[in-house]
């Protein structure tokens, strides 16, 4: 009998439907506590409801005065538009370096609103991670070009020394080297946990562009950019979608989890997991409701969560 159930499930599971769910989810820029994440969560909810399930959305506060255990929550963030242009010697915009509308991760997530022209500086030493890198260098009101860990550079440059923002061209170390992915952008975000007020903006460029700017700065060129970010922070929510298939033994359950968040498109991390779980739950509900599959002994509970939070 178990073999028959297995065959039934194999026939009923649709890889094409799972792929369609991946396509739908990846249309949303779904970082934690954002309108894009909420839109993806609504899509999951609608699909579960259409399959006869009764999903519930649990909303946990995205606010700086809230803590989950020892971890502070954070404000929700929405970005309407953001661009970064290179300026010529006359102060006119020439090359478009970054555009949130085209590539959302070309903006450092959770940037504050800004509009203005800024000189770009690059630091020696550890690239802005340590206080010694700033000796004899005035970064106040300037944009710091760096590929080093964002949190440490932002603290040193923006918080302690009044830099306006960060221009980031780093790539995650590991088996890759810079030349393997010269045109890749690394997903990067400020985190303003707890009572710390957001105080900076930033953009992300690829290694190729970053190296060109570094070479020009090293040669004495005056590199200036025009930055525009339209964003807002507000008390929002971290949403968790839950669906449940009851079992015949009320005290026992199987818990299935997928994280729904991450920047657009992030198909493998983790739209694929969220879509697979969605397809499994709707398939099982259909088979059980039609009588083709008996109700399981243990309940099956699925949750779609924002990773590391909520």
Regions found by a protein language model. Give the residues of each.
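Generic start-of-chain signal for non-secretory N-termini
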Residues: 1-20
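Metal-dependent peptidase/peptidase-like ectodomains
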Residues: 6, 13, 97, 202-203, ...
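Catalytic-core environment of secreted peptidases
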Residues: 15-37, 47-55, 73-74, 143-148, ...
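Extracellular/luminal Protease-associated
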Residues: 23, 35, 98-201, 265, ...
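Short alpha-helical segments and helix-capping/turn motifs at coil-helix boundaries
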Residues: 41, 67-71, 129-132, 148-159, ...
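Soluble metallo-hydrolase cores and metallopeptidase-like ectodomains found primarily
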Residues: 102-131, 189-270, 279-282, 286-291, ...
């Amino acid at each position: 009998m178990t073999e028959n159930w297995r065959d039934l499930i194999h026939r009923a599971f649709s890889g094409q439907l799972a792929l369609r769910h991946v396509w739908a989810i990846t249309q949303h820029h779904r970082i934690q506590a954002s309108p894009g994440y909420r839109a993806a969560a609504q899509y999951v909810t609608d699909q579960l409801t259409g399959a006869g399930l009764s999903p519930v959305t649990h909303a946990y506060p995205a606010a700086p005065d809230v803590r989950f255990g020892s971890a502070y929550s954070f404000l929700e963030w929405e970005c309407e538009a953001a661009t970064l242009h290179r300026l010529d010697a006359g102060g006119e915009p020439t090359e478009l370096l970054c555009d949130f509308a085209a590539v959302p991760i070309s903006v450092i997530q959770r940037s504050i609103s800004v509009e203005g022209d800024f000189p770009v500086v690059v630091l020696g030493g550890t690239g802005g991670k340590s206080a010694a890198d700033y000796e004899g260098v005035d970064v106040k009101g300037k944009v710091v070009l760096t590929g080093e860990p964002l949190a440490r550079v932002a603290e040193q440059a923006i918080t302690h020394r009044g830099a306006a923002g960060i221009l980031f061209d780093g790539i995650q170390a590991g088996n890759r080297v810079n030349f393997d992915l010269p045109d890749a952008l690394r997903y990067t975000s400020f985190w303003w946990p707890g009572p710390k007020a957001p105080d900076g903006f930033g953009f992300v460029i690829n290694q190729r562009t970053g190296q060109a700017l570094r070479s020009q700065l090293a040669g004495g060129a005056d590199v200036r950019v025009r930055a525009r970010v339209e964003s807002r922070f507000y008390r929002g929510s971290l949403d968790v979608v839950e669906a449940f298939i009851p079992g015949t033994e009320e005290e026992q359950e199987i818990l299935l989890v997928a994280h729904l968040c991450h920047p657009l498109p992030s198909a493998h991390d983790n739209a694929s997991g969220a879509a697979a779980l969605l397809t499994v739950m709707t398939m099982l509900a259909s088979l059980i409701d039609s009588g083709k599959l008996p109700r399981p002994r243990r309940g099956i509970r699925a949750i779609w969560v924002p990773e590391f939070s909520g």
